[in-house]
Amino acid sequence: MRTQWPSPAKLNLFLYITGQRADGYHTLQTLFQFLDYGDTISIELRDDGDIRLLTPVEGVEHEDNLIVRAARLLMKTAADSGRLPTGSGANISIDKRLPMGGGLGGGSSNAATVLVALNHLWQCGLSMDELAEMGLTLGADVPVFVRGHAAFAEGVGEILTPVDPPEKWYLVAHPGVSIPTPVIFKDPELPRNTPKRSIETLLKCEFSNDCEVIARKRFREVDAVLSWLLEYAPSRLTGTGACVFAEFDTESEARQVLEQAPEWLNGFVAKGANLSPLHRAML
């Protein structure tokens, strides 16, 4: 029997870089919100203990794929604690809609969906805390997808406080370039000393993203899309890019702007969601 699981996108409604640790990782303050749009992961259980990804990603080795790594990590963790039923395995496939290097959290979301779904399907019984801790070893954004609620994040993104920002409508646009996260974080001109503020203060301020100035300067495609969107609505970069988003109060407003978009602008309209579509599917 094949089951399907949402793997939603996220937006960083704001992102501030507050410092850099000795190990090179950047400390930040950011606000995560999910979208009711994303990839779909299909899982069919096996009884021979094997993990197979039926939809490989070009240029990514099978065992290096975050989906496979997440499944193997859950398998090992559950087995080590005697909570993995004998023969547990899975065939996994993905209907990929989220771009790589887009700042929408696609890979992290995929890993989280696999952890949550297989924990349920294999009946391992691991807690959300355990799954989030495992997820952090796969990527800094994985825990927020595992926990499934919009959150204010600090540290390197692993210290999460659930929040409920307004669930607006967004026009999300992809400039047609992929921006690897290290390209932004290694840039010498990236602001790295934004003062820390309380979540209460930040929620009252105008939102912005410290990475945006670098993305616009280094990638003219990002600058072009943002310049166009800003004519219509408050707009900014998500994560380290490359995707940007404009926010609206209604779906019709967002769709009207998308209909006017030039041919070179690829985008979609989605609603913000404080409860992840993955967790909504589990209810």
Swiss-Prot record:
GO biological process, one term: isopentenyl diphosphate biosynthetic process, methylerythritol 4-phosphate pathway
UniProt EC number: 2.7.1.148
Pathway annotation from the record: Isoprenoid biosynthesis; isopentenyl diphosphate biosynthesis via DXP pathway; isopentenyl diphosphate from 1-deoxy-D-xylulose 5-phosphate: step 3/6
Entry keyword set: ATP-binding, Isoprene biosynthesis, Kinase, Nucleotide-binding, Transferase
Binding sites annotated in the UniProt record for ATP: P99, M100, G101, G102, G103, L104, G105, G106, G107, S108, S109
Keyword presence, ATP-binding: yes
GO molecular function: 4-(cytidine 5'-diphospho)-2-C-methyl-D-erythritol kinase activity; ATP binding
Pfam families with a match to the protein in the record: GHMP_kinases_C, GHMP_kinases_N
HAMAP family in UniProt: IspE
Family under the similarity heading: Belongs to the GHMP kinase family. IspE subfamily.
Quaternary structure (record): Homodimer.
Summary of the function given for this chain in its UniProt record: Catalyzes the phosphorylation of the position 2 hydroxy group of 4-diphosphocytidyl-2C-methyl-D-erythritol. Phosphorylates isopentenyl phosphate at low rates. Also acts on isopentenol, and, much less efficiently, dimethylallyl alcohol. Dimethylallyl monophosphate does not serve as a substrate.
Name of protein: 4-diphosphocytidyl-2-C-methyl-D-erythritol kinase
